[in-house]
Structure formats: C-alpha cells, structure tokens
Amino acid sequence: MQHAYNEAISAWIADEVPIGAVVVHDEQIIATAHNQTRTQNDPTAHAEMIAITIAANHIGDWRLNECKLFVTKEPCPMCSGATIMSRIGEVHFSFEDPKMGGLGGAISLHCLLYTSPSPRDRTRSRMPSSA
C-alpha cells in the first residue's frame, strides 16, 4: 500500500486528486498510477483505470484474476466496474468513500441484484394499451 500512497503524493504534487493505485501479480508490482484527469484532460484517467490498463498490457491479457489492486481510496463506480470487468482477484483500499464509493461506500456494484424482463416483456411495456 505504501507504493499507492507514494503515487497519491505524486498526484497531489501534479495538482490532481491525490489517489494512487498499484497492481500486484505474483507478489510483484506490475503497474502503478495516480489520478491524471486534469493533466490528461480525461475524466476517465483515474489511478485505478490507468493501473488496470498498464497491468493488462504487462500481462498481455485483459483478465487480471490473479492480480491484486491496492488503492488509497475506495474506487468510484467507474473504477469499480473496471475492476469487475477485468476480473481483478482482490481489491484493497485504505478507506471507504461514502459519497462516490462503488464497492460498499455509496453503492455496492460487486453485489447488485437485478431482474431483466424478457425482450418480449420490454416490447409489450412500450406499446400503448390500444395497440
């Protein structure tokens, strides 16, 4: 986690939101990143997103199920979605984010229950009753 804190300090020095992330595979750090939304003028340039991309390129596969993500703050819904889609094996964060956290702080993307109507039901619900 210390490496993630160091990345957060780098973000702060660069006038970014001070969040850092590290991806570990087989006990080796394979990716480090910090927020770069202002620097890159990119709202998706969060530490977790960048670190996940670097890790996938390093491994040569988008599936990161053998990896661990260490991040200084609970990932937002976008970053939480990326951890789910990349199949990160474990996520460790220093503190919850009750306003924007996607893994329990504000919302729990990893354990949402949902129902989805069949396509026929969706079609029916859009048609007026007189049709």
List each model region and its residues:
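Local cysteine-cluster metal-coordination motifs and their immediate loop/turn environment
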Residues: 73-86
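A short, polar/charged loop-to-alpha-helix boundary motif
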Residues: 39-49
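Short beta->alpha transition motifs characteristic of CBS
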Residues: 31-37
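Iron-sulfur (Fe-S) cluster-binding segments and ferredoxin-like electron-carrier domains
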Residues: 84-99
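Conserved small/polar residues in nucleotide/adenosyl-binding loops
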Residues: 114-119, 123
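Short beta-strand scaffold segments in enzyme catalytic cores
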Residues: 19-24
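Short, basic/aromatic recognition patches
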Residues: 1-13
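Hydrophobic alpha-helical segments, chiefly the membrane-spanning helices
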Residues: 126-131
